[in-house]
Amino acid sequence: MTVHRKEGCTNMKNIPVYRFPAGHARENGELELYRASNKANTACKEAIEKAISEHYCDNVLHREAVAQVAEQFGHERILYVLAITIRQKDWDGRFSADNKQWAKTVPVSENLDAWGTDRNCYLAVNSHSGLVDLFTKLAREDARAHERKPSVLGRLKNRPPEAAAEAVKKTKEPSL
């Protein structure tokens, strides 16, 4: 899998989120997928930290922070990294109960190294927990909004065959 870089900007939206531990990847010949996903997860974590830093002003975290990261990584990866972050910091009272509950619903495999340390700890966002909580709330809202808005192409693909045939028939009939 090739990751394309364009003048410092990296688009990793098309790299699938690999949700299994390194051992599973090794056993199934999927190490390349695991490594590409892990690289994208790390870059996403860093992009979230940067976006929070750039878009937190006057005690407000602006929605552009999420849009900036989503453009590069997509919502699935952002939410995966945020779920890992909240799970790793479950003891932290600055995360809302709602976000903690949500994080428990996201499938994340424990990924132990040779010393018994969960490799997921390296993917935890290192910004202020209160700001990460706000970012998570905004990211979840943004992901829901994008779920509800299918693209025009998506609507055409999901259109029943009868409706598509009727639309074609109407365009071919001459107007009277």
Question: Can you annotate each of these PLM segments?
Answer:
Residues M1-S175:
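Gram-negative host-targeted secretion-system effectors, predominantly Type III and Type IV
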